[in-house]
Design a protein with these regions (language model features):
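Conserved active-site/ligand-binding neighborhood in enzyme cores
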Residues: 1-319
Length: 319
């Protein structure tokens, strides 16, 4: 499989996060409009329990990966860490701050790939060997809008509603890691030329979700030499037998149908709610594979509509 690093450079605010499942939906609609419905159906039919011709991660800030979800600190580990602080209050403040960190530097994962635990993470942070903090590349603000009467096409006086927009700083980059066995480099670029021009996510018709992109060949992750677990880099919906146990965070996804179906289709614009496992979640599999999860069928009244639940795994060793 070809490996690409897709570098997204936002040029407007985004209302929709750069999640693997949403990105896959945009790729499918781009393929439908550029190559036709038969080509899209041919692509989707290649997915099965043993084959995934396209594996996508979420979009992460440059040089960062998702913070792993690990076993909580034991009482003994907590006491040991607390001794490094002058007061219990200082320790409590630091722990509160660390629990809000959503990303970890790739260099920190390289150091800890063979001995990953919260205790080791926090110890190296306290010693100054790594720095655990969220990258400062974006800000999320409420943007207020006028409500509109759909019958009269006029603004309703005094009625406002807010939406959250994420604004990215100058030079901000989000990296999506791709494993591709279907498209060649030229056709993959055609897909993202289309998406970058039409926009990504909610309110793209009014300028949200605009971006430029680069596509670089190859990427290497810091993977454990003797792994006993994997960390998902994607929003992931597991299938039976993927793993025995794990540590994870969940999100309920209300997927929305895109393309010309978004303006009206039997069954409405929304898919059925799905429970997804967030990037950074860790699992102990019986065997290590190149991907986990599958396309999820029967998520809408329209036959053939699927949802992307495939995980790009990073092999690690949990201690």
């Amino acid at each position: 499989m070809a490996r690409y690093r897709l570098i997204i450079k936002p040029t407007s605010s985004f209302q929709t996060p750069l999640h693997s499942d949403t990105l896959f939906g945009h790729i499918c609609w781009a393929l439908r409009y550029l190559k036709g419905e038969d080509e899209l159906l041919k692509f989707l039919k290649l997915f099965n329990d043993d084959n995934s011709p396209l594996i996508l991660s979420d979009g992460f800030p440059k040089d960062y990966l998702p913070m792993p979800v690990l076993r909580p600190l034991s009482l003994d580990e907590e006491k040991e860490l607390q001794q490094k602080y002058r007061t219990k209050l200082e320790f409590a403040r630091e722990m509160k701050m660390l629990k809000k960190v959503s990303y970890i530097q790739v260099s920190a994962m390289e150091m800890l790939k063979n001995e990953l635990s919260y205790y080791n993470l926090y110890t190296k942070h306290l010693l100054g060997e790594i720095l655990l903090e969220n990258p400062n590349i974006s800000k999320t603000d409420e943007v207020w809008h006028n409500a509109k009467n759909r019958l009269t096409d006029r603004v309703i006086e005094g009625k406002l509603f807010a939406k959250e927009d994420t604004f990215y700083g100058k030079g901000a980059e989000l990296n999506v890691y791709v494993e591709d066995a279907y498209f060649n480099r030229k056709s993959f670029c055609e897909i993202f030329d289309f998406i970058s021009k039409s926009g990504y996510g909610a309110d793209k018709s009014v300028g949200r979700g605009a971006f430029e992109y680069d596509l670089l060949d190859g990427w290497d992750f810091p993977e454990a030499e003797n792994p006993n677990a994997f960390m998902t880099l994607s929003h992931y919906h597991p299938k039976e037998g993927d793993f025995k146990e794990g540590f994870y965070d969940t999100a309920t996804k209300f997927g929305k149908i895109g393309g010309h179906w978004a303006s009206g289709v039997d069954g409405g614009p929304y898919k059925m709610p799905l429970l997804m496992l967030n990037p950074g979640s860790l699992f102990f599999p019986d065997t290590h594979k190149t991907f986990y999860g599958s396309l999820i069928p029967n998520v809408h009244k329209q036959q053939g509509v699927v949802h992307y639940g495939i995980a790009l795994p990073l092999k690690v060793r949990i201690v």
